[in-house]
Amino acid sequence: MAIKPGMGRKSSSKNPPIFSHEFVIQNHADIISCVAMVFVVALMDESTSPFASAFISLHHNVTGEEPSRENPHGKPFSYVAGIKDYCAIFFYTLTCIIMHAIIQEYVLDKVSKRLHLSKFKLSLFNESGQLIVFYVFSFFMGANVILREGYLSKFSLLWEQFPNHPMSFLHKLFFIIQLAYYLHMLPELYFQKVKKEDQQSKIIHSICGFSVICLAYTFSFQRIALVLLTLHYLGEIVSHVFQLIGVFDRDEKLASVRFVNNVTFVFVRFATMVIGVLTLYYGVATETVLRAYAALVGLMVLQGYLIYSFITEELRATREAKREAKQHQQQQAKKSKAAKEKAKKKKESDLPEADQSPSPAKAKAK
């Protein structure tokens, strides 16, 4: 019986052997979907529901009440970080892998087939396309939580009563999704057949993103982490939009508007450092000095690294642009010189034979 290739990879003419690497890669979305469905089905049975709910539901609620006759509306639940969260992170990591394959199969692959991109630009297109979807989703989800919790209208909520900062349902779900997404980047290196020379930067991105968010989530910095992540994703959205523009804009007609990316990056980095100093140095430090200073130093080191990487990349791009411009000028000069010589020869060929300048061979014979 023929096996239909799964989502997320291009289908091949031959069906690979079952349980081979190629089979797993081609059908990884279907395999992961089956694993996820096991937890969903187990949730429907009373005997397995407690086990399955540990992976699907959010736990460690500290306040809240279910609706009752005395209180028909109940009370909203609030949550804290706990060990059971890693079960939920595992399940939502499976969900992220499935969504990654769906976006790749039904959006990015269909668009890339019409563009006829080179391998390098195709890699950039797929990477930026996937990240933009995640960043846009995270930005709007984070902004929604910020507005609901009133962190903009009352900025002091970021440090008041620290570390007693219980989270709402959406606030906790935001962090579970963040941790799951950065964790799913590691198996995607295998599923997407990423070359070894391209894996290092992606592994660093995955591990650093997961570690930073996990530390903020575990040590009760969920409020400031929510604000800073939402702000960071705004800059990442603009950055990857311009990266996609670079893929589509083959003639570099829109190169002049790339300063918007630079302005956004500077704004995000400056706003991040200001919010970090106000919250950690002037707010949290009044409650727990050591934890606040450690978080502030870590935040500043991270911002310094991002600024250094940005400046290095801009200098490299500037050098490449100058080198390409110089090569273009040299090519234009050669073409202009060749055109002048051709025009001169054509002009001489139109003259009578007696008026034409003798060729070097004829002059030597004389």
Question: Where in this protein do the model-derived segments appear?
Answer:
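Intrinsically disordered, low-complexity regions enriched in proline, serine, glycine
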Residues: 224-227, 239-240, 275-276, 320
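Transmembrane helix-bundle signature of multi-pass membrane transporters/permeases
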Residues: 229-233, 262-266
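Hydrophobic alpha-helical membrane segments of integral membrane proteins
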Residues: 200, 223-231
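Membrane-helix and juxtamembrane interface regions of eukaryotic multi-pass membrane proteins
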Residues: 1-220, 246-265, 271-366
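Alpha-helical transmembrane segments and their membrane-interface exit regions
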Residues: 231-242
